[in-house]
Amino acid sequence: MIYKVYYQETKERNPQRETTQSLYLEAETEVAARTLVEDNTDHNIEFIEPLEGNFLDYEQKNPEYHLTEFNK
């Protein structure tokens, strides 16, 4: 499944909506998606949203859409 992960670049500051960023990744579960991001970045994860159906189609039309892959 594809997940959209909303995050802040650092855990040092409190989250601010204006500085929230996102990435897309493929994982088996939401827990696996969180683990991938936590193990490979210093990001402060705010929310993980599963994408499927019309929601995924909409996101894929965004020019910023690309799947993030981490080296294992």
UniProtKB/Swiss-Prot annotation:
Q: What is its EC number?
A: 2.7.7.6
EC category name:
transferase
State the GO CC annotations. DNA-directed RNA polymerase complex
InterPro entries tied to this protein: RpoY
Q: Which reaction does it catalyse?
A: RNA(n) + a ribonucleoside 5'-triphosphate = RNA(n+1) + diphosphate
Q: Which Pfam families match?
A: RpoY
**Record key words, sorted:** DNA-directed RNA polymerase, Nucleotidyltransferase, Transcription, Transferase
Q: Does the keyword Ligase apply?
A: no
Q: Which GO terms describe its biological process?
A: DNA-templated transcription
Q: Name one GO molecular function term.
A: DNA-directed RNA polymerase activity
Quaternary arrangement and interactors, per the entry? RNAP is composed of a core of 2 alpha, a beta and a beta' subunit. The core is associated with a delta subunit, and at least one of epsilon or omega. When a sigma factor is associated with the core the holoenzyme is formed, which can initiate transcription.
The UniProt function text for this chain reads:
A non-essential component of RNA polymerase (RNAP).
Q: Which family does it belong to?
A: Belongs to the RNA polymerase subunit epsilon family.
Record's protein name: DNA-directed RNA polymerase subunit epsilon
Protein species of origin: Lactiplantibacillus plantarum (strain ATCC BAA-793 / NCIMB 8826 / WCFS1)
What's the gene? rpoY
